[in-house]
């Protein structure tokens, strides 16, 4: 993939960009096999990859520069701003949005936040696109509510210029730290969630809920989990760290009992809406800590699916799952190193299947799906 930003030395986020896609994929497979070398694997699935450019459905842009000439992109460690509006990882539809946002920032008087001076209002722009209909969600991350009414007043013009904008919010992040968002979300449009669909499963993207950034590969990941689970005798499953319910909703059947647990209330609201749209009556989503939920249960499900953050599922949940001993565990991970460590804590299980999903081209990162069966 060619990238003018990389060639000019302005961005090094895609550290593997000079390697051909096949070479990147082979290196990731080697890394995964090395991490699981001490754990016998029954079946290695063929790695899954997607487009090498224009695959991201989300842009997280630091806003810098001046109110008259804002820059949207990132800051180097020395504070030097870099405009990333022409990043080839974004879909072509984003370019028109970025072009419209720069003069809008000036019209609305949203002074970019200056980290060194601790002054200004607009910290980030967070843009997400649905592959279902091209609809967009735009979040303005502000230091305070000082410019909120100016933003409201100017917004109708932006919505008229960009009719694909379906959800717009202001997020208040008052802390002088590199934190992407604060706790308070203020909706500026009537619509509060972006409609999405993978493999015929309706999903909803809300402002403060995690959603995969590579829709093509994420769709394949969910479909694979569905195929694995539905081939097993599963009547009751848990989906821990469930997010908006992508895994559980793909796996669930009308007869199956599914319990989905996620700490973020916004994500649970999305999951419940999807379950209702699918007509699933034996599905229960709750906004709880996954470890606290699991360790407080007595009944043992047939299968537990976990999709934890990069740090893994943690010692307490590892020990509890080992003690509880469900017949099957499906582990989806964006950090194979912590996954391998967690699986090493389950001596009573064997790895039946493993498959790599190249969710993050041009980097060393990848997603991996593993099926474990109790011995």
UniProtKB/Swiss-Prot annotation:
Catalytic activity entry: uridine(747) in 23S rRNA + S-adenosyl-L-methionine = 5-methyluridine(747) in 23S rRNA + S-adenosyl-L-homocysteine + H(+)
GO molecular function annotations of the record: 4 iron, 4 sulfur cluster binding; iron ion binding; rRNA (uridine-C5-)-methyltransferase activity
A GO BP entry: rRNA base methylation
InterPro entries reported for this sequence: 23SrRNA_MeTrfase_RlmC (IPR011825), MeTrfase_TrmA_AS (IPR030390), MeTrfase_TrmA_CS (IPR030391), SAM-dependent_MTases_sf (IPR029063), U5_MeTrfase_fam (IPR010280)
Enzyme active site: 334 (nucleophile)
Superkingdom of origin: Bacteria
PROSITE patterns: SAM_MT_RNA_M5U (PS51687), TRMA_1 (PS01230), TRMA_2 (PS01231)
Binding-site positions, S-adenosyl-L-methionine: 212, 241, 262, 307
Gene3D superfamilies: 2.40.50.1070, Vaccinia Virus protein VP39
The keyword ATP-binding appears for this protein: no
Protein purpose: Catalyzes the formation of 5-methyl-uridine at position 747 (m5U747) in 23S rRNA.
Name assigned to this protein: 23S rRNA (uracil(747)-C(5))-methyltransferase RlmC
Species lineage: Bacteria, Pseudomonadati, Pseudomonadota, Gammaproteobacteria, Enterobacterales
């Amino acid at each position: 993939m060619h990238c003018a930003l990389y060639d000019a030395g302005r961005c090094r986020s895609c550290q593997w960009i000079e390697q051909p896609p096949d070479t990147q994929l082979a290196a990731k497979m080697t890394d995964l096999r090395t991490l699981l070398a001490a754990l016998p694997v029954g079946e290695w699935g063929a790695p899954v990859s997607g487009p090498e450019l224009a695959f991201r459905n989300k842009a997280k842009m630091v806003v810098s520069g001046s109110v008259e000439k804002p820059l949207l992109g990132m800051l180097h460690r020395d504070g030097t701003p870099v405009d990333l509006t022409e990043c080839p990882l974004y879909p072509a539809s984003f370019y028109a949005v970025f072009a419209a946002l720069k003069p809008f920032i000036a019209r609305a008087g949203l002074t970019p936040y200056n980290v060194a001076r601790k002054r200004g209002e607009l910290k980030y722009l967070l843009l997400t696109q649905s592959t279902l209909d091209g609809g967009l969600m735009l979040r303005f991350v502000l230091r305070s509510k000082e410019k909120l009414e100016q933003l409201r007043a100017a917004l109708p013009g932006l919505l008229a210029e960009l009719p694909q904008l379906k959800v717009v919010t202001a997020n208040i992040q008052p802390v002088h730290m590199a934190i992407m968002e604060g706790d308070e979300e203020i909706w500026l449009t009537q619509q509060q969630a972006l409609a999405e669909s993978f493999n015929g499963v309706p999903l909803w993207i809300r402002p403060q809920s995690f959603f995969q950034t590579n829709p093509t590969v994420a769709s394949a990941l969910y479909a694979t989990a569905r195929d694995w689970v539905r081939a097993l005798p599963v009547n009751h499953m848990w989906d821990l760290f469930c997010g908006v319910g992508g895994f559980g909703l793909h796996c669930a059947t009308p007869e199956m009992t599914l319990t989905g647990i996620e700490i973020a209330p916004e994500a649970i609201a999305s999951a419940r809406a999807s379950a209702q749209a699918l007509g699933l009556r034996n599905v229960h989503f709750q906004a709880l800590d996954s470890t606290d939920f699991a360790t407080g249960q007595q009944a043992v499900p047939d299968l537990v699916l976990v999709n934890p953050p990069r740090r893994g599922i943690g010692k307490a949940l590892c020990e509890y799952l080992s003690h509880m001993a469900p017949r099957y565990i499906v582990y989806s991970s964006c950090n194979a190193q912590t996954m391998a460590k967690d699986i090493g804590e389950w001596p009573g299980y064997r790895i039946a299947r493993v498959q790599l999903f190249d969710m993050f081209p041009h980097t060393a990162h990848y997603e991996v799906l593993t099926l474990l069966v109790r011995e």
